[in-house]
Curated annotation (Swiss-Prot):
Comment text on domains: Has the structural arrangement of an alpha-helix connected to a beta-sheet by disulfide bonds (CSalpha/beta).
Pfam families tied to this protein: Toxin_2
Name of the molecule in the record: Potassium channel toxin alpha-KTx 2.12
Tissue: Expressed by the venom gland.
Function description: Weakly blocks Kv1.3/KCNA3 voltage-gated potassium channels (Kd is estimated to be 69 nM).
A cellular component annotation (GO) from this entry: extracellular region
Top-rank taxon: Eukaryota
Annotated site (Basic residue of the functional dyad): 28
Record family assignment: Belongs to the short scorpion toxin superfamily. Potassium channel inhibitor family. Alpha-KTx 02 subfamily.
Gene3D superfamilies: Knottin, scorpion toxin-like
Signal peptide from the UniProt entry: none
Upper classification of the organism: Eukaryota, Metazoa, Ecdysozoa, Arthropoda, Chelicerata
Molecular function GO terms recorded: ion channel inhibitor activity; potassium channel regulator activity; toxin activity
Amino acid sequence: TIINVKCTSPKQCLPPCKEIYGRHAGAKCMNGKCHCSKI
């Protein structure tokens, strides 16, 4: 899932991804946007 959060590193994406998927969230930063996934 691409979320509308700008990022330069995956660490910035983890908090918003955890809000969506809980503690089993995976976060990636691609093309300046956060991509969340459920692990």
